[in-house]
């Protein structure tokens, strides 16, 4: 598992080094984003220049499980909602989540902006569709951008990933 993650990270770096000018094809639009584990791994790799140990990964998963359990106890309506499996089992960010749910799974964003020019640059060819509802953008590791209207996640884009 560690070798696979390291291989993926190295291939991403090689891909970045060999690419020329970014094109619209480099941006994808999605209804589902990364998992909490993927965000954790990206943050850890960026912060420590290595992959987490088994113990560090286990500690993260235990803490995440506790946060999710606490959230569900405070918000029982989520347990019976259609997005319950995304939140409780897959731990994957998906359109329709609230800011609190996104933060619970993905942590705090690297950047928060309401600047339309920055959002347009990130969304590229998808901006005409996204701008209708997107009022705020959160930027996360792995070049993920989450677009919000008020408290709800309304769109997701990712830069530089193979087709989802």
Predicted regions mapped to residue ranges:
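Sec-dependent bacterial lipoprotein signal peptides
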Residues: 1-14
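Residues within mature, well-folded domains
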Residues: 17-164
């Amino acid at each position: 598992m560690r070798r696979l993650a390291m291989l993926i990270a190295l291939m991403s770096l090689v891909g970045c080094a060999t690419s020329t000018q970014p094109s619209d094809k480099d941006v994808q639009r999605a209804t589902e984003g990364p998992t909490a584990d993927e965000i954790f791994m990206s943050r850890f790799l960026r912060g420590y220049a290595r992959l987490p140990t088994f113990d560090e990964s286990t500690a993260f998963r235990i803490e995440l499980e506790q946060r999710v359990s606490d959230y569900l106890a405070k918000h029982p309506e989520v347990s019976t909602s259609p997005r319950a499996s995304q939140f409780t089992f897959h731990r994957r960010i998906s359109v329709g989540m609230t800011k609190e749910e996104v933060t619970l799974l993905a942590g705090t964003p690297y950047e928060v902006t309401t600047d339309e020019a920055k959002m347009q640059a990130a969304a590229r060819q998808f901006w005409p569709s996204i701008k209708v509802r997107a009022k705020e953008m959160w930027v996360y590791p792995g070049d993920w951008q989450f677009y919000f209207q008020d408290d709800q996640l309304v769109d997701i884009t990712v830069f530089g990933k193979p087709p989802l």
